[in-house]
């Protein structure tokens, strides 16, 4: 594969800027979700099974222990980003967040902080806290789970917020100089390529620094799993994902960094689509598609030109 020559990928971007490989280490901060505990809603998003975020052992380790454990598993990197991934990693009092984030960045060889959260859980005090780390020289990314820009779909999947909420949070973050990475799902019920391209267009118009693309995973324990088991919902086919994600990449400005272009999961948690068991399947097909049809930005006549590392 030669994805770095076809897509402005986060790994390549980090290597160019830091002069060496930088690896993300995922953390479980013990946070909850306001869309489950009644603060915003109950039941959670219809695609979500929170147990899939982290293994049980990870949940019971300290931040320092989690980072040390994961760093030992990474052979090719000596610099790391601390990534608070599970649940809603800004859903706590600011003093609790400060303690968590500080524990992470104070560990050896941590050069940055990535915080995954919902657009409706990022008050000004949290943005200001993240800015403190940015101003100290850390690489800081606010990762917002948007999934889609279509309010009808957001309601259908029980997200508990609308696209306007995402726009407000993104604009406030970027006004402070924070980098925003938006998570988008391809294959949501009722959406096809046209809707996904519309989502991309609206995200780019709002302003964004990075994007994560993710095929819809139907996972055990989710509300969607019940629809799948009843035959009312199908997982997205690899061919359809490749076509839609490929066109989204081709319609993305070259300066936007792709943090991820596919995602995998394992059985028994994963019910469908089973091609997502293979972490390389989506990337191999996208590599082929983009080689045939054009690189990131080519549909805008602004093709991605790889920079010398």
Map each language-model feature to its residues.
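Auxiliary Fe-S-binding modules of radical SAM enzymes
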Residues: 2-12, 18-23, 210, 218-309
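Distinct, well-ordered alpha-helical segments
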Residues: 94-102, 123-134, 154-157, 196
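Conserved C-terminal portion of the radical SAM core fold
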Residues: 164-223, 239-262
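Acidic (Asp/Glu)-rich catalytic clusters
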Residues: 72-76, 100-108, 128-139, 171-175
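Core AdoMet radical
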Residues: 51-66, 70, 74-94, 109-122, ...
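Hydrophobic faces of well-ordered beta-strands that scaffold small-molecule active sites
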Residues: 23-27, 80-85, 113-115, 140-144, ...
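Structural recognition of alpha->loop->beta junctions
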Residues: 45, 104-110, 198-212, 281-297
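N-terminal [4Fe-4S]-dependent radical SAM core
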Residues: 1-81
